[in-house]
Amino acid sequence: LNFEWLKKIASSDCVLREKMTLFWANVFVCRDNHILHIIQFNNTLRNHALGDFGAFVKAVSRTPSMLKYLNNNRNVKFKPNENFARELLELFTLGLGNYSEQDIKEAARAFTGWNFKPNGDFILRTNKHDENPKTFLGISGNLGGDDVIDIILKQRQCAEFICKKIYTYFV
């Protein structure tokens, strides 16, 4: 896929969009053998490559490829799976050392029930979602996945982490 992106970058009317799409694909890494799901993932990267970072994170987090890759499609209220929450915090938004293990556990609970329909559309399976109060990065309430992402985005460290990645990529 990277070779195809390089060809697209070379022939695109919007070189910056394609370069940022490739950049985001190397930050929000996932693998999927389902061709339609990976196309949807790549299109999500492209559609949000130059837009609002919060909308981008929420959209990427809902793609079947990301849900499967980090096992969030198996994240249910009585057995939370921490893979997606951990990667969201460590690799995608804040960086190591800027959250606690308890924050990971609480974020995992907030993302319970996130899944996708056979056609690839996102669905929140409410019967598998933990509706109980959570405390994440010092904020308490009946938090869902979008709330966790919003809290992350309010952290100065998130901006610094992403800006450093972009700077390193371009410079």
Question: What do the PLM-derived regions correspond to, one by one?
Answer:
Residues 1-48, 73:
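N-terminal accessory alpha/beta regions
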Residues 5, 38-171:
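Active-site substrate-binding loop specific to GH73 endo-beta-N-acetylglucosaminidase modules
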